[in-house]
Amino acid sequence: EAAPLESSPLESAPLAPAAEASLQADDDLPPLSRTTNILVLGSDRRPRMPNWRTDVIMIVAMDLASGQAGVISIPRDVYISPIPNHQPNRINVIDYLGEQDEPDGGGPKLLASIIEENMGIPIHHYLRFDFEGFKEVVDALGGLEITLDCPVSDYLLGEDIAIRLDPVTHRLDGKQALAYVRSRRQGGDLERSRRQQRVIWAVRDQIQRENMISKVPALYAALHDSVQTDIGLVSAIRYVRFALALQEEDVHGFVLGPPDLLTSGWRGGMSIFVADWELITEQVQTIFDRPPFMETNTVGENSAQTRCP
């Protein structure tokens, strides 16, 4: 029998157990200090590569009391300075740097501390996967149903994956879904972040559509080698049940982007985004006042006005 993630040292020490335990409906607290916040990381980590970069950086905020959720995406080229014990760099290397300092969980811990310092959002848990892990999760769910507003066409050389999708509803397998969330050919980082948020909702939809809640413990154990997390099985089931009870209008999306929150620039020969952390800290707290998730994850005002990149 496969060992559950609960037995892993990665699961034994939540990033902020005391903080999560003290969550309460206190109107004096900022909204994202009243939520359970999960850092979701997706990297290009491979066995043959000594280092890696993080392509997916999202914060999933769950307000368990009010029945709302928010998804905040951070582009990978956001410049971070300072980074404790390291030179300033893009945010997409911080997971790697943290693991060099403290193997088996130091990366999410370092990134969580930087997010809290710069954005004022406490991180309680993390979920981290690489390319193979992502494909295994999607295939274990039986694929994901995604409706496109605009065509997506790309070839990912490093993974030898070609994708060409028309603006209709598709069922994507793990390999296709990986290309969908990694492609930057249409719309760059901003559109890629929106597609990644759509995949979060597609996972929820697939679990509900196939009535897979009873299979969560088996999936949790089977994905032991593909996904690292500090979320225990009991909490995982609780969070899945919470997600299944959400309606589209209960979920709000926020993608950090230019020109107000991020400004393009160069540092050390790298193309970067310079963040206005003061404005970001203020704006992310308004996430539950923003339009529903799927409205902010469409390209145009409505289907008749879609403007594709």
What are these regions (language model features)?
Residues 1-309:
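Non-catalytic, solvent-exposed segments at the cell envelope interface
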